[in-house]
Amino acid sequence: MNFSLLTTEMLTALLGIGLLAIGLLNRKKDSHRGVAYAAVFGLLGILVVTFFQYGINTNTFHQLWILDDYSVFMKEIFLVAAILVILSAIDYVDGLPRFKTEFYALLVFATLGMMVMASANDLVTLYVGMELMTITFFILVAYILGDGRSSEAGVKYLLLGGASSAVLLYGLSLLYGLTGTTVIPDLLARLTWSPALAIAVVTIIAGFGFKISAVPFHMWSPDIYEGAPTPVTGFLAAASKAAGFAVLVRLFLEGMPLQGGADWLTVIAVLAGVTMVIGNVVAIPQTNIKRMLAYSSVAQAGYLLVGLMSTDAPGVKGILFYAMLYVVANMGAFAVATAVGRAIGSDEIADYAGLSQRQPLLASVMTISLLSLAGIPPLAGFVGKLYLFSAIMDKGVLWPAFLGFVMSMVSVYYYLNVSLYMWRDDPKDDRPIPVSGPMKLTVIFSMVVTVILGIYPGPLAEVATVAAKSLF
């Protein structure tokens, strides 16, 4: 047993426990800011550690745990998302009545759950990591004490999340019953086609469909995203979705008979197509920025599912690259939503009118983030979609790429609608919106990375290629 393969997870666990201890020992009014900075520097240190884990590609604990380049890349996505959400949440947490320091500890523990999911090579390990992530989100979604919308969102997420976890666990238990093992690679060697396997695969797809907000398992996301604290919404929409795909890719490429008995690629293709269409079309009439971004995140899941359809290294490379840029752009958009919502007390798109006059930086970051999500060149989103769609086109399947292109053009409408409010209309209030140092750092980082990855994607694409090849 090689405990060194768990270095990043052990450090993350120690960081979360340390943050809780600091919060208990120091109850001063502004102590949460010090805790936030400690969390950021701790996560940055862990991120640096991951750079030295490339090339290991081995497992331990009787194959229950795997550390390969794929899992390392995914962990870096989660860590980047966690750092950005903590920086963007510092001012927001100022307005919370109680339990300020615990907020950051919960974000760290949610990140730990995602990291466990990425390295899980066993169904039980996978489920433990997923539940660690999910339970912390149950708390974070309902974190605004005395707020009816937040409490309602928390209850909805608890009930629906618990139901989806039960469905997923049923599917995993069927796999164990069919094969006698919970080690994912062994499933491929032992699985034979049967009706029970069909039920198992359907329930697993349903369970993870909830986690990634794929249609028709997406209905929870708009209400939960709207009611949850805005920084939590961003983290849930970006990092949690990436964690779901981290597992889906490993399960379906290593442990599922995608071409045996029935064509499960067809199921994935249908999910991808419907998810892209429903997510983009329903986003058009939304008047609340968080609900609009919720349906946008549904559509983004459809694009990522197109990459899964290719079942090869280029497709996985596209998923990894797009997941990273999606996290960065999405966190930038939600950081702006956090700052604006805190300043004006509203999340309505109409209230973004004249934002370019009140705070040009926030308007610029929101515009670039939304255009990147739409796939407009020369931003990173264009390159990411190019990788995803070209991977499936190389397989000779053209319709997902064509549908994805059409739906990307549809998304331009509702993304530009927000931009028009910000740049064309006059503000209802002339007072400038304050932007603190941590928030400014978050949005500038998001904007710069989104632009640079669009112009010069080579280095990240090369790392994503290496990570993808570790699965094959």
Swiss-Prot record:
Entry's EC annotation: 7.1.1.-
GO biological process terms on file: ATP synthesis coupled electron transport
MF-aspect GO terms: NADH dehydrogenase (ubiquinone) activity; NADH:ubiquinone reductase (non-electrogenic) activity; quinone binding
Membrane topology: Multi-pass membrane protein
Record key words, sorted: Cell membrane, Membrane, NAD, Quinone, Translocase, Transmembrane, Transmembrane helix, Transport
Keyword Translocase in annotation: yes
Subunit-structure text: NDH-1 is composed of 14 different subunits. Subunits NuoA, H, J, K, L, M, N constitute the membrane sector of the complex.
Family according to the record: Belongs to the complex I subunit 2 family.
Name this protein carries in UniProt: NADH-quinone oxidoreductase subunit N
